[in-house]
Swiss-Prot record:
Biological source species: Xenopus laevis (African clawed frog)
Origin: domain of life: Eukaryota
Family that this chain belongs to: Belongs to the G-protein coupled receptor 1 family. Endothelin receptor subfamily.
Residue intervals on the Extracellular side: 19-88, 146-161, 227-254, 329-365
CDD domains: 7tmA_ET-CR
Compositional bias of kind Basic and acidic residues: 424-434
UniProt xrefs under Gene3D superfamilies: Rhodopsin 7-helix transmembrane proteins (1.20.1070.10)
Keyword entries, A-Z: Cell membrane, G-protein coupled receptor, Glycoprotein, Membrane, Receptor, Signal, Transducer, Transmembrane, Transmembrane helix
Glycan-linked positions: 60
Identification of the protein by name: Endothelin-3 receptor
C-alpha cells in the first residue's frame, strides 16, 4: 500500500511539472510572423534525445531524392527545445530524493544479504544483483542527470548512455533468472533449500553480467560525440551518427528502438508470464495430502514468488513511459517521412516534431527518464512492504545503526538448539552456530 502511495505521489509531482511546462510553452510560442527575430539560446538538455536528432537527419537525407514537384520539408524549429525552470527544479529535487533513498535502501539490502547466513540463497543473490546494478546506476547516472539540467557536456552524456543501458540489461536478465528460479523451486517441492550460495547460481550470476557486457558492445562502438551546427552554434551531442560504415551498424540503427523495447522490456514480462503460469499449474496439481504436509514450506516459497512478481510489476510501470516515448518519436518520424514522399502538404503528423509538439516529446522523454530512475530506489522499499523476512531484517539493520543491539539468551531446550536475539524490540531467530555459542556463555 505504501509503495502505491509513493508511486502516486511521484506521478503527481511529475504531472505538476508537465502542466506548468505546457502552460509556459503556450505563452512563449505565439504566432511568430518574423522568423528572423532574436531567439532565446538557452542551452537544452540533450540526454536520450538521440532518435529525434537522428530521424530528422535521416528525413533531410531522404527528401533529397524526391522529385522537384515534391513539397519541401517542414521549416526548422524557430528555437531550440528547452526545459523550463519549474520542470528543472522538480526533476532535480526528485533526483536528490532518489539518490538518498536508493543509496540507503540498496546498500542496506546488500549488507543484509552479506551479513546474514540465512539470507544467502539463490533468489536473494539475484536480488542482490539487482541492488548492485541499481547502486551502480545511482552513483554514476543520477548525478549526471541532475547536473546536466544546468550544465550539459557530451562526455557526461556518453557515460550516462552506457551506464543506463548496461543497468537495464542486468535488470532484465536478473528478472528472467528470478522467474525461472521460482518455477524450479515450486516444481521441485521436495528439494530442501540449503543455506549458502550454490555454485550453479554463482555461475548464473556471472553469466548475467558477462552477457550484459557483450550486448553492450554495439552501443559502446556506435555511440559517438557528434558536432551539430544549429543557427551558428556548435552543439556537442552523444548520438548514433547518421552515416554508419558497416552493414551491421546500419541495421542496428534501424531496429534500435524495437530491440531495446523487446529485449529490455518485453523479455522479462514474457518470462514472468510463462513461468508464473507454469508455477500456478504446478501448485494446483499437488495432491491435497502433500499440500497439507508441505504447507509451511510452500508458504515460504509463495512469499518469495510474490516478492519477485512485485519487482516485475514495478519494473513494468517504471520503464513503460520511456519506451513509449521512444517508440512514439520513431513512429512520428516515419509517418512524417511518408507524408513528405507522398506529396501531402497538410499531413498532421508532419508537424509533430516542431513547435509545441516537440516540447511535448521532450516532456514525455524526461518523464520516462525519471520513472526509470525511480525504479533504482523503489526495489528495497517494495521488499520492505511485501516480504516479512526482509522487513524484519531492514528494521533490525537500520535500527542497529542508531542504537547498540542487546543480546538476551533464551535456551529453548537442553541441547541448546534454540535462541533469540532481541534488538530494539524485534525478535529474530538465531542460527545454530550462534545458539551454541550463546548457550556456551550462558552455561558458564
Amino acid at each position: 500500500m505504501a509503495t502505491v502511495i509513493l508511486f502516486v505521489a511521484w506521478m503527481a509531482c511529475l504531472m505538476v511539472g508537465v502542466c506548468y511546462q505546457e502552460f509556459q510553452t503556450q505563452q512563449n510560442f505565439p504566432d511568430i510572423s518574423n522568423p528572423s527575430q532574436e531567439l532565446n539560446q538557452e542551452p537544452a538538455h540533450r540526454i536520450v534525445q538521440l532518435d529525434s536528432i537522428q530521424n530528422n537527419g535521416a528525413l533531410n537525407m531522404s527528401t533529397g531524392n524526391v522529385l522537384n514537384m515534391s513539397p519541401p520539408p517542414p521549416s526548422p524549429c524557430l528555437s531550440r527545445a528547452k526545459i523550463r525552470h519549474a520542470f528543472k527544479y522538480v526533476t532535480t529535487i526528485l533526483s536528490c530524493v532518489i539518490f538518498l533513498v536508493g543509496i540507503v535502501g540498496n546498500s542496506t539490502l546488500l549488507r543484509i544479504i552479506y551479513k546474514n547466513k540465512c539470507m544467502r540463497n539463490g533468489p536473494n543473490v539475484l536480488i542482490a544483483s539487482l541492488a548492485l546494478g541499481d547502486l551502480f546506476y545511482i552513483l554514476i547516472a543520477i548525478p549526471i542527470i541532475s547536473i546536466s539540467f544546468w550544465l550539459s557536456t557530451g562526455h557526461s552524456e556518453y557515460i550516462y548512455q552506457l551506464v543506463h543501458l548496461y543497468r537495464a540489461r542486468v535488470y532484465s536478465l536478473s528478472l528472467c533468472a528470478l522467474s525461472i528460479d521460482r518455477y524450479r523451486a515450486v516444481a521441485s517441492w521436495n528439494r530442501i533449500r540449503s543455506i549458502g550460495i550454490p555454485v550453479r547460481k554463482a555461475i548464473e550470476l556471472t553469466l548475467i553480467w558477462a552477457v550484459a557486457i557483450i550486448v553492450a558492445v554495439p552501443e559502446a562502438i556506435a555511440f559517438n560525440l557528434v558536432e551539430l551546427d544549429f543557427r551558428g552554434q556548435t552543439i556537442l551531442v552523444c548520438m548514433l551518427p547518421m552515416e554508419q560504415t558497416s552493414d551491421f551498424m546500419r541495421f542496428y540503427q534501424e531496429v534500435k528502438v524495437w530491440w531495446l523495447f523487446g529485449f529490455y522490456f518485453c523479455l522479462p514480462l514474457a518470462c514472468t508470464g510463462v513461468f508464473y503460469t507454469l508455477m500456478s499449474c504446478e501448485m494446483l496439481s499437488i495432491k491435497n495430502g502433500m499440500r497439507i504436509a508441505l504447507n509451511d514450506h510452500m508458504k515460504q516459497r509463495r512469499e518469495v514468488a510474490k516478492t519477485v512478481f512485485c519487482l516485475v510489476v514495478i519494473f513494468a510501470l517504471c520503464w513503460l513511459p520511456l519506451h513509449v516515448s521512444s517508440i512514439f518519436v520513431r513512429l512520428s518520424a516515419t509517418v512524417k517521412r511518408a507524408c513528405i514522399l507522398k506529396n501531402k502538404r497538410s499531413c498532421i503528423m508532419a508537424e509533430i516534431q516542431t513547435g509545441v509538439n516537440y516540447q511535448l516529446l521532450m516532456v514525455m522523454n524526461y518523464t520516462g527518464i525519471n520513472m526509470a530512475s525511480l525504479n533504482s530506489c523503489i526495489g528495497p522499499v517494495a521488499l520492505y512492504f511485501v516480504s516479512r523476512k526482509f522487513k524484519n531484517c531492514f528494521q533490525s539493520c537500520l535500527c542497529c545503526w542508531c542504537h547498540r543491539p542487546t543480546l538476551t539468551i533464551t535456551p529453548m531446550d537442553e541441547k541448546g538448539s534454540g535462541g533469540k536475539w532481541k534488538a530494539n524490540g524485534h525478535d529474530l531467530d538465531l542460527d545454530r552456530s550462534s545458539s551454541r555459542l550463546s548457550n556456551k556463555y550462558s552455561s558458564s
